[in-house]
Amino acid sequence: MDADSINSFFLIGALLAAVSVLLSPMSSRLGIPILLIFLAVGILAGEDGLGGIQFDDYSTAYLVSNLALAIILLDGGMRTRVASFRVALWPALSLATFGVAITTSITGLMAAWLFDLHWLQGLLVGAIVGSTDAAAVFSLLKGRSLNERVGATLEIESGSNDPMAVFLTVTLIAILANVDTELSVSFMLVSFIKQFGLGICLGLGGGWLLWKLVNLSKLAEGLYSILVLSGGLIIYAVSNKLGGSGILSIYLVGLFLGNKPTRGRHSILNVLDGMTWVSQIGMFLVLGLLLTPSDLFDILLPGFALAFGMILFARPLAVWLSLLPFKSFSSRDRWFISWVGLRGAVPIILAVFPMMAGLPGAQLYFNLAFFVVLVSLLIQGASLTTAARLAKVELPPKPLPISRSGVEIYPSSEWEVFVYCLSENKWCVGEPLKRLSMPDGTRIAAVFRGDKLLHPSGSTCLEAGDILCVLGQERSLDALSHLFSQAPETKEVPRFFGDFFIETDVKLADLAPIYGLDLDEEASEMTVADLVASELGAHPVIGDHFQWQSLHWVVAGLHEGKVTNIGIRLPPET
């Protein structure tokens, strides 16, 4: 490649990236996933599009996609709270194993029938599109206030279901490439355990080593993110080389680092956020360039049948069967999880495997995977907000600071600066600072009024539009945000949580005359907390609800896993 070719490559790549960024606001206006914008730019620049760029280098696409996916999973792992595993780990693992196997089987049989394939070829198609995509799920769920059990289940599932899909895809390719191959059940079981076992061990072990290395190193601030990124990729590559799941390993590395006091954590997350965007843009641009849209016309009708069969039948059945042992999921939860079986980059990456193995019909597998991904992003991704509202798994938005940054004075520092802008409707406007009931361990460090810095004292009166810089820790975030942030609309919280709020240490007998409860002797001795435990089990989350004695009860507050407040909605005729 000469200098002119290199400059042309830089020019085209930068132009496509810039166009993708500038067009990204269209996603919210059109109600479509932003990943679809990136993919569309790549397709339009490709062979059948306006750009006319001919790109059919599957090896390069495989390299770029794997690198991008590794970075996205590292970032996603660092942003996942390990506390969410308390309510979502086992359901997510059930979906990541049994769910993928069921989806693969049903989708594979449909593909074999629709495209007149051998049943093994059909199963290969099912395996390729059988797993949800972490990049798509993390991207579309980021910033959404969902029921914790549902949101965490979807995120953990998407970060851990790729080993099953990779295992099934590689196994079926081996059988189809050599029809004389005899793969025993024991061999397949060992391979499966190896994928998961090595992936988990190397992810957690490597995460611990990398965490120690980061905290023991004294580097320039910008280098910590490079160390984490390179260390994560080393563990990803080693896991893959040894036959484990690199995808699972790097997700667990991120999970370990994100839930430990890590030096430079906030700067690492800021850098990874930018790297994740670059990865998503680069990956979907390359995958878009790889597609020749005219090839999809030949599979249009059966392709739609396959995609909708998977979305409306295979995925829901897999979810309902996989979640049968978990009674904490309501029917609405299960329907929403079924609908958010988003397909993205992973099926397309897996579809490259048969191309690189030289299997007959590999181009059909690739086109089918791409078609299913397009339909999934267009239909499921675009309707995510509506689905969450209909399933009632979306919580009222929490008030948040306009920005937050870490104060990393020592490796395990958890101090942060939260920045709030006071709106006119906050009760503290016009009040002196000494009248504020600040949470323990917090302090107002600075007050900005216009472009002036005030020196806050107890007599400083707050005004609408003031910018407050508050020093505190994450555990105080909810209390601070309710004190200073713009709250949700007043009608929104009662609509979701109910008409009245009560604390859970109140006895049901005290509520009986107010709400007309008919209590037996046992119920008369119960508190609201006892009622919640008997109705919802050991691990309730905010937004969980149940019907009892004609009243609708909704969990409205939690502290350290225990329900502190509950909302009560009266029956319509009351």
Curated annotation (Swiss-Prot):
Its main location: membrane. The chain crosses the membrane at residues 6-26, 30-50, 58-78, 87-107, 109-129, 173-193, 196-216, 219-239, 242-262, 271-291, 299-319, 335-355, 359-379. It catalyses: K(+)(in) + H(+)(out) = K(+)(out) + H(+)(in). Pfam families: CorC_HlyC, Na_H_Exchanger, TrkA_C. It comes from Shewanella sp. (strain W3-18-1). This is K(+)/H(+) antiporter NhaP2. GO terms for biological process: cell volume homeostasis. It is a multi-pass membrane protein. Keywords: Antiport, Cell inner membrane, Cell membrane, Ion transport, Membrane, Potassium, Potassium transport, Transmembrane, Transmembrane helix, Transport. InterPro entries: Cation/H_exchanger_TM, FAD-bd_PCMH-like_sf, FAD-bd_PCMH_sub2, Na+/solute_symporter_sf, NhaP2, RCK_C, RCK_C_sf, Transptr-assoc_dom. GO terms for molecular function: flavin adenine dinucleotide binding; potassium:proton antiporter activity. Residues 405-486 form the RCK C-terminal domain. The keyword Nuclease does not apply. Belongs to the monovalent cation:proton antiporter 1 (CPA1) transporter (TC 2.A.36) family. NhaP2 subfamily. K(+)/H(+) antiporter that extrudes potassium in exchange for external protons and maintains the internal concentration of potassium under toxic levels. One of its GO terms (cellular component) is plasma membrane. It is found in: Cell inner membrane.
